[in-house]
Regions:
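C-terminal motif of bacterial Sec signal peptides marking the signal peptidase cleavage site
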Residues: 14-15
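Serine-hydrolase catalytic core recognition
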Residues: 312-481
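Non-catalytic carbohydrate-binding regions of carbohydrate-active enzymes
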Residues: 302, 306
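Conserved beta-propeller blade repeats
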Residues: 35-53, 80-98, 109, 125-144, ...
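Sec-dependent signal peptide recognition
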Residues: 2-7
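Short, linear, compositionally biased motifs with a strong N-terminal bias
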Residues: 10-11, 69
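Beta-propeller blade-edge and WD-like acidic-aromatic loop motif
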Residues: 21-26, 49, 53-74, 93-94, ...
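N-terminal pre-domain segments of enzymes
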Residues: 22-37
Length: 481
């Protein structure tokens, strides 16, 4: 009797496995590439709309969405060139957007007027222009341009309604501008010396004094100035494995660590009224956002969102609304509105192809395995839903570009297609990858194609240890390495 019960139980288990594998819908590859890609999300002055970039038309164009009604309208009508939203013009429905020609990567800044006519604000043929944000009073915007010398980017500003370029900083020494103070007196400048180190300077545009801020070999990047122009903030990894946030008092030169984590701080900025500090952390291949209420010294808590995690935010000028970018490995990024007064969120876009069921896609997980020398290697793993001991599946080792780089948790159409078709994917973040400390990052210096490649091979060995993998069918895929 006992044997009969055990046998019946095993049959039930196998039957459930077979049923589960049969109930998973498998999709053609074109369905995965019919997802809509969405980026940006910039508030209008009255905070009633958000401008964003979307390829819903088949190519990237500028769109806007009404926050109250949720109605979306297409502002540009390109069918040949990709147009990328940059910002609304203050107190206007006009917009700035960026575009190149024929994929030549020589991007210009365009004005999209309220009547939807356009003006190229940076018209020189070989001029590459990059939007750099607005002045504090929003009467002009800043941008970088190489029109003077195509080797270097100078900093310009352009006044609204005049649209004439005004040179602010001429880059003669290959010192790139990273930030400008509100009074336009101070500039933070950077010059890279290696792939992981740079020199960092404070330039006084009034006295013409150049002060070196970097006081040790490492990485430095700007996190902006205080409103009163007395302090700036920067991110560095000097003396530590992971990047952290510091402040620097301009008059005294006093520096202070104001935030650090067990992972890299990627970026940080203050909200318009300096009520909130936003900090983005690269935590084990995921973006962890920390928003600090500076007045109360507390962390802002967000409501849970089913579609995924919050990857980036933008706080409105009134500091009453937030634009959230929300996505996961099963859902491409969408734009949400978060009302800070009511504590409510509202989904404003839909990026996943409605012909795809997210329940039949796979959530990525972070795994680790030991390489040939015992070093622990992180990886992002996708296990097919139909995989089991009785239904063994093939596998692929996924290799990201390099040197540096990192495969992160997020939505990848090709990966989801392959996993849906029954391929396990192990995206190896081999030694030399970013995000795991500067020692790990430097481990394949002058050694490309040796130890980093062995990490990928040992990733294959890890796959072979999984009892649902067909060990005779393991391949490798990737590019740009």
């Amino acid at each position: 009797m006992k044997r009969l019960l055990i046998g019946a139980a095993l049959l039930l288990i196998y039957s459930c496995e077979d049923t589960a594998s049969k109930s998973i819908a498998q999709y053609d590859i074109d369905l995965f590439f019919k997802n809509i890609s969405i980026g940006g999300g910039y508030f209008s002055s009255d905070e009633s709309k958000l401008a964003f970039t979307s390829n819903a038309s088949g190519i990237y164009n500028v769109y806007e969405v009404d926050i109250n009604s949720g109605e979306t309208s297409q502002r540009t009508q390109s069918d040949t060139e990709s147009f990328y939203a940059l910002s609304y013009i203050p107190n206007s429905n006009a917009l700035l957007y960026s575009a190149d020609k024929g994929g030549n990567e020589i991007s210009h800044i365009y004005l999209l007027k309220e009547d939807n006519s356009t003006v190229d604000l940076t018209p020189e043929e070989t001029e590459k222009a990059r939007f750099f944000g607005w002045s504090k009073v929003r009467t002009c915007f800043y941008y970088q341009s190489n029109k003077r010398d195509e080797r270097f980017f100078d900093l310009y500003k352009m006044k609204v309604d005049e649209w004439d370029p005004i040179l602010m900083y001429e880059n003669q020494q290959n010192l790139s501008v990273e930030s400008v103070s509100n009074n336009e007196r101070y500039f933070l400048l950077s010059k890279y010396t290696t792939t992981s180190t740079n020199d960092f300077y404070l330039f006084d545009n009034q006295t013409r004094a150049l002060t070196q801020v970097s006081d040790g070999a490492g990485s430095y990047s700007s996190a902006g100035f205080s409103d009163d122009n007395t302090t700036f903030f920067f991110i560095t990894d000097v003396g530590k494995e992971f990047a952290y946030l510091k402040s620097y008092e301009i008059e005294s030169g006093k520096q202070e660590v104001i935030y650090e984590s067990d992972w890299d701080v990627m970026y940080s900025y203050l909200s318009e009224k300096e009520t909130y500090r936003v900090i983005g952390i690269n935590e084990d291949g995921r973006t962890n956002l920390v928003i600090l209420d500076i007045n109360n010294d507390t962390e802002v808590n967000f409501p849970e969102i089913q579609d995924g995690s919050i990857n980036s935010i933008s706080i409105s000028k009134s500091e009453e609304k937030m634009r959230l970018s929300v996505g996961s490995s099963k859902n491409p990024s969408n734009i949400y509105l978060y009302d800070m007064k009511s504590n409510r969120t509202k989904k404003l876009t839909q990026s996943l192809n409605p012909e795809l069921n997210a329940d039949h896609l796979v959530a990525a997980e972070v795994v680790r395995f030991s390489s040939f020398d015992g070093l622990e290697i992180p990886a992002i793993y996708y296990k097919p839903l139909q995989a089991s001991k009785r239904n063994k599946v093939p596998a692929l080792v996924w290799v990201h570009g390099g040197p540096g780089g990192q495969t992160r948790v997020g939505y990848y159409s090709l990966i989801q297609y392959l996993v849906n078709q029954g391929y396990a994917i192990l995206a190896v973040n081999n030694r030399g990858s970013s995000g795991y400390g500067k020692s790990f990052y430097k481990m394949d210096d002058r050694n490309h194609g040796d130890k980093d490649l062995k990490d990928c091979i040992w990733g294959k060995k890890w796959l072979q240890e999984q009892n649902y993998i067909d060990t005779d069918k393991i391949g490798i895929i990737g590019g740009s390495y």
